[in-house]
Curated annotation (Swiss-Prot):
It comes from the Bacteria. Residues 136-139 are annotated as: G4. Pfam families: GTP_EFTU (PF00009), GTP_EFTU_D2 (PF03144), GTP_EFTU_D3 (PF03143). Residues 60-64 are annotated as: G2. This is Elongation factor Tu 2. Its EC number is 3.6.5.3. GTP hydrolase that promotes the GTP-dependent binding of aminoacyl-tRNA to the A-site of ribosomes during protein biosynthesis. SUPFAM superfamilies: EF-Tu/eEF-1alpha/eIF2-gamma C-terminal domain, P-loop containing nucleoside triphosphate hydrolases, Translation proteins. One of its GO terms (molecular function) is GTPase activity. Residues 174-176 are annotated as: G5.
Length: 396
């Protein structure tokens, strides 16, 4: 299948479907592509094309994810859909498919179910900023009061996990009717309403280049007569020659000045998000900087050791541990470019964590790391990945 040219003319937003098994996530994904392709161009995808999600690897974990794209009048969307619950958990925790917003699919016939709740909680923990609800299978419910009841339940559940339940758009429809070409309010019209909600309710994400400058340190060299050069890939923002920057993590924060930016052995006056650069630092000694630290705009990110996280523990089949771990387990946490040892505190009443589980934990690292909510990490033992996680809340 040939790759279509990626249209850059419209702003780009990443979304995905979440929700309980068999509530219609994949059917809805197919319906969105077919209705919007007919209206705005693009490719309609059939249910089985999406359901046969290819395997991909993220942070050493194999995940099945289907990627589709579609356009509305104003935007271009990349949309992820996962075949199984475990794939959602892994996807959201590793950040393999970052979501600027999620479409929560709830069957009107069943109402919220255990995975509905779990996916909302995961969305909160991993920092999915916006949720829109598609109340599916409404053609199977004749009772308007019942629909209202289900809608109320969903809003309460969103509130419980700190999403704005009252103001969340909830669209009533039937993905199946839309797939069958039904032009009525439950069919294509519901899909168009959903598209409008995506456009109006999910704001455009901040582009990496607009963020505060941040570059994880990959390597450090000393160049005689010129000073210390730090190399890495700029994660966000822009660094200009002459700007003050901080070196954050592992040791006390230090201030320094960028006196040069190099890319492919050429001198530049700035480096920006996505660039692999060498940054020359004024008056900084080679031994003052190490892998695992970050260079950043002063004050934009702080070093921390204590945080809550949401983790997925690899199963034995995925090359993970063969045995459970217990409270105070001390693996290495791999942040950006380095490992830091930390101790895990399990939630109250949870005795142990089995391979294949996902769980909320509290971590204390032995060295501080430049950290903010949403930062991803791997959990390793002797260089082998045994889990993946994301910082949910910084404690200290």
């Amino acid at each position: 299948m040939g790759k279509e040219k990626f249209s850059r003319s419209k702003p780009h937003v990443n979304v995905g479907t979440i929700g309980h098994v068999d509530h219609g996530k994949t059917t809805l994904t197919a319906a969105i592509t077919s209705v919007l392709a007919a209206k705005f161009g693009g490719t309609a995808k059939a249910y089985d094309q999406i359901d046969a999600a290819p395997e991909e690897k993220a942070r050493g974990i194999t995940i099945n994810t289907a990627h589709v794209e579609y356009e509305t009048a104003n935007r271009h969307y990349a949309h992820v859909d996962c075949p199984g619950h475990a794939d959602y958990v892994k996807n959201m925790i590793t950040g393999a498919a970052q979501m600027d917003g999620a479409i929560l699919v709830v069957s009107a016939a069943d109402g919220p179910m255990p995975q509905t709740r779990e996916h909302i909680l995961l969305a909160r923990q991993v920092g999915v900023p916006y949720i829109i609800v598609f109340l599916n299978k409404c053609d199977m419910v004749d009772d308007a009061e019942l629909l209202e009841l289900v809608e109320m339940e969903v809003r309460e559940l969103l509130d419980k996990y700190e999403f704005p339940g009252d103001t969340t758009p909830i669209i009533h429809g039937s993905a199946k009717l839309a797939m069958e070409g039904d032009k009525g309010p439950m069919g294509e019209q519901a899909i168009m309403k959903l598209a409008d909600a995506l456009d109006s309710y999910i704001p455009l994400p901040e582009r990496a280049i607009d963020g505060a400058f941040l570059m994880p340190v990959e390597d450090v060299f000393s160049i005689s007569g010129r000073g210390t050069v730090v190399t890495g890939r700029v994660e966000r923002g822009i660094i200009k020659v002459g700007e003050e920057i901080e070196i954050v993590g592992i040791h006390d924060t230090q201030k320094t000045t960028c006196t040069g930016v190099e890319m492919f052995r050429k001198l530049l006056d700035q480096g920006q998000a996505g660039d692999n650069v060498g940054i020359l630092l004024r008056g900084t000694k080679r031994e003052d900087v190490q892998r695992g630290q970050v260079l950043c705009k002063p004050g934009s990110i702080k070093p921390h050791t204590h945080f809550t996280g949401e983790i997925y523990v690899l199963s034995k089949d995925e090359g993970g541990r063969h045995t459970p771990f217990f409270n105070n387990y001390r693996p290495q946490f791999y942040f950006r470019t380095t490992d830091v040892t930390g101790a895990i505190e399990l939630p109250e009443g949870k005795e142990m964590v089995m391979p294949g589980d996902n769980v909320s934990i509290i971590v204390k690292l032995i060295n501080p790391i430049a950290m903010e909510e949403g930062l991803r990490f791997a959990i390793r033992e002797g260089g082998k990945t045994v889990g993946a996680g994301v910082v949910a809340k910084v404690i200290a």
